[in-house]
């Protein structure tokens, strides 16, 4: 945000070597770099976040993030609102995605609430109600899937202003039409 890049501390120790490579690349871009401290219990993975700049909202999962890792990122981004969504996927993006309008503002969200905790589902609907936006509910097969069948990961998306790039169509074609 505004020339700031945050280098996270992955939960998987073998992935932490990536940080040195990423830092070298970012230094050439002349960005301000904030590195997550190497503190016990502080972890965060990129797939566990969606930052929506226009609304200044950070969505975070807690599967591979820790609460103190999420707080570090939220503080560094100076967000107006933090929405934590816990679910059964291995990253937030396996069961949730925001949708942005052409101006870059959140205009709806897509979520597999069947994979979310009750508290997270309530937090999501409270957030959506505060913006008066729809929540498009999808089944597990459009997300990470079930124990017996892998999903199509349609919700694992890249939300861009006016466009949602996702690997598969949603099983309900009306969702793709409406977003």
Predicted regions and their residues:
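The feature marks the mature, well-folded catalytic cores of soluble enzymes
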Residues: 1-179
């Amino acid at each position: 945000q505004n020339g700031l890049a945050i280098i996270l501390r992955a939960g998987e120790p073998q992935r932490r070597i990536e940080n040195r490579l990423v830092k070298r690349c970012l230094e050439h871009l002349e960005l301000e770099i904030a590195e997550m401290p190497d503190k016990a219990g502080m972890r965060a993975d990129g797939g566990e976040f969606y930052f929506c700049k226009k609304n200044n909202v950070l969505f975070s999962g807690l599967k591979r993030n820790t609460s103190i890792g999420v707080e570090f990122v939220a503080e560094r981004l100076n967000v107006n609102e933090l929405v934590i969504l816990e679910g059964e996927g291995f990253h937030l993006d396996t069961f949730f995605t925001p949708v942005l309008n052409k101006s870059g503002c959140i205009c709806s969200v897509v979520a597999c609430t069947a994979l979310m905790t009750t508290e997270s589902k309530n937090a999501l609907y409270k957030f959506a109600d505060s913006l008066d936006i729809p929540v498009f509910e999808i089944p597990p097969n459009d997300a990470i899937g079930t124990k017996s069948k892998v999903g199509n990961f349609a919700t694992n998306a890249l939300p861009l202003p006016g466009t949602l790039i996702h690997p598969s169509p949603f099983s309900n074609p009306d969702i793709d039409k409406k977003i």
